[in-house]
Amino acid sequence: YNKDFPIYPGELVVIQAPPKSMKTMLVQNWVNSFKRPTYFLEMEMSPRQIWKRFIQIEMGWSEEELSRKYAQSNFKMADKFDWLNVDYQPCFAIELEKRISMLPVKPEIVIVDHMGLMLSKHRDLNLKMEEIAGALTDVAIKHNVIVVAICEITKSAMQEGMSISSVRGSFRIAYNASKILSLTTSKNQEGDVTNMVIKTEANRERGALNVLLKVNGIRIEAPTEPRRPLDG
């Protein structure tokens, strides 16, 4: 996106966003562009949904194009995603490290979508989020990986400008996270998301992020700047 905002191994990055803000699609675009060994814990979408999106992002296909290609007998895409391991089974936060350790290829990036769907023995929301945030931080540090965790926040809280640290049950997330990013979207008259803004809410390192992105079908891209006329 033409921005300098480094994220380092050993860091927990939390993305706070309200429901239906395309947060999963955003991180799918990210990891697909990096194509680094990735463990993607997806607890909200079905395997069919998640892989359909990944293929569309990679190939730039519409749903109709994907359906036509899929109907062909020689359709094959697995080799394009040998860097990706998707897991759909929710687990306790403490079990995540064991799952990663058992992978044949150590991941460089771990995605958790989303934190609220992880299992916990705690019924109290504060204790649950404290446990999960602490475990994700441990995974990032012990395995020297980047952990990106999505955390849902209410629309009213986002509209009031509240950060994740001021939402009930989320103080420990803010305490543990190396970086906290907020995601907001704008829609057209038909209700389709057309743009999104990613901003830094907290960062232990130097640097801030405030970027406007354009939603182009299934891809999320930086807006193209109009060409300047040549002088003279």
Where in the sequence are the language-model features?
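Cytosolic-facing regulatory segments adjacent to core modules
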Residues: 2-4, 25, 29, 36-106, ...
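The Walker A (P-loop) glycine that initiates the GxxxxGKT/S ATP-binding motif of P-loop NTPases
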Residues: 16-17
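Pre-Walker A (Motif I) flank of P-loop NTPase domains
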Residues: 8-13
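Helical hairpin unit composed of two closely spaced alpha helices linked by a short loop
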Residues: 107-146
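C-terminal regions of RecA-like/P-loop NTPase motor modules
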Residues: 94-110, 139-143, 155-232
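Conserved glycine(s) of the Walker
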Residues: 22
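Flexible beta-alpha connector loops of hexameric P-loop NTPases
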Residues: 85-87, 119-130, 159-165
